[in-house]
């Protein structure tokens, strides 16, 4: 399973790390994307005009037609904090638009609701039209029709709240099971560290051993009474990629991403665990960052925008060999 990553605002609503992909209407559109059946990266085609998408309102059961750019504004408002610089919002808009268009061939929520997407953050993408500001509208307008592509195909526009200073690859941050995408990379993010508040950057969490057993067992792992927890493998950025749980029945090794998800992604904010003390009483952890660490760091985008980077410079910084393309005027 591949995850997008809880945004700065959306993460406060859901503790889960979500897979976040959207689709636009399957009605025939001039210049629409080629539609496949396997959900793989799609070839980029231009549109003659801005698409309209269908949206299922989970709260009311209503189905609504909405222009793409209006929808993107609601997504950006839901995924980022208020009062941020315009170019940070604009970078987020490019990724949100890329996600939406990349899923045109995958059916969206048509099997469930007969629509392209829903307002459920667990099913698609965070959406909050009531929080759209003038600055967000300006950012969406400034990037109208823009998406991020690699070799003529849409990228998986992963993002996360904070990288802790360096982003990582999908196989490490997400335990991504497919081939590593050619456009992911590890990138130092000094602009993030220059601007992020300490309470956003650093975190700590503690659990009793009984809690560890209960939470990890709930994910389908068979554990005896837990005796010790340790990190046995890290990636080059320092993120835990394999965690060992020693218990009465032996030991169980799980990925760092699975460990974080099991214990709660709102408490274990990232796999960039800088300290883990395991005793008979429980475990205490410290770490940096928030989210899986793959793709664009939102606090990195904030810092880069504050220091004068354009939206295009921001999004291309976090991915390898990509370019921004404009698909409609």
Where are these regions (language model features)?
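Conserved, single-site charged/polar hotspot
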Residues: 1-329
């Amino acid at each position: 399973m591949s995850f997008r990553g809880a945004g700065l605002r959306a993460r406060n609503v859901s503790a889960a790390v979500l897979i976040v992909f959207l689709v636009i209407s399957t009605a025939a559109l001039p210049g629409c994307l080629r539609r496949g059946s396997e959900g793989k990266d799609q070839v980029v085609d231009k549109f003659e005009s801005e698409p309209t998408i269908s949206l299922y309102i989970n709260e009311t059961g209503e189905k609504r037609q909405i222009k793409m750019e209006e929808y993107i504004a609601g997504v950006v408002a839901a995924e980022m904090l208020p009062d941020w610089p315009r170019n940070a919002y604009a970078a987020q808009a490019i990724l949100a638009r890329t996600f939406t268009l990349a899923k045109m061939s995958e059916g969206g929520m048509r099997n469930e609701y007969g629509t392209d997407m829903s307002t459920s953050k667990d099913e698609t993408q965070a959406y909050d039209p009531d929080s759209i500001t003038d600055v967000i509208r300006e950012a969406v307008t400034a990037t109208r029709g823009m998406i991020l592509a690699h070799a003529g195909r849409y990228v998986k526009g992963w993002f996360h709240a904070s990288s802790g200073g360096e982003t990582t690859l999908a196989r490490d941050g997400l335990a991504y099971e497919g081939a590593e995408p050619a456009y992911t990379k590890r990138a130092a993010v000094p602009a993030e560290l220059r601007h992020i508040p300490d309470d956003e950057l650093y975190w700590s969490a503690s659990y009793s051993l009984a809690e560890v057993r209960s939470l990890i067992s709930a994910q389908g792992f068979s554990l005896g009474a837990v005796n010790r927890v340790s990190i046995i493998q890290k990636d080059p950025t320092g993120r835990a990629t394999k965690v060992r749980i020693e218990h009465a029945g032996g030991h169980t090794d799980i990925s760092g991403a699975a460990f974080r998800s099991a214990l709660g992604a709102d408490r274990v904010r990232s796999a960039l665990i800088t300290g883990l003390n395991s005793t008979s009483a429980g475990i205490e952890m410290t770490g940096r960052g928030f989210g899986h660490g793959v793709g664009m760091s939102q606090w990195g985008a904030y810092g880069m925008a504050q220091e004068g980077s354009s939206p295009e410079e921001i999004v291309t910084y976090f991915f390898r060999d990509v370019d921004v393309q404009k698909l409609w005027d």
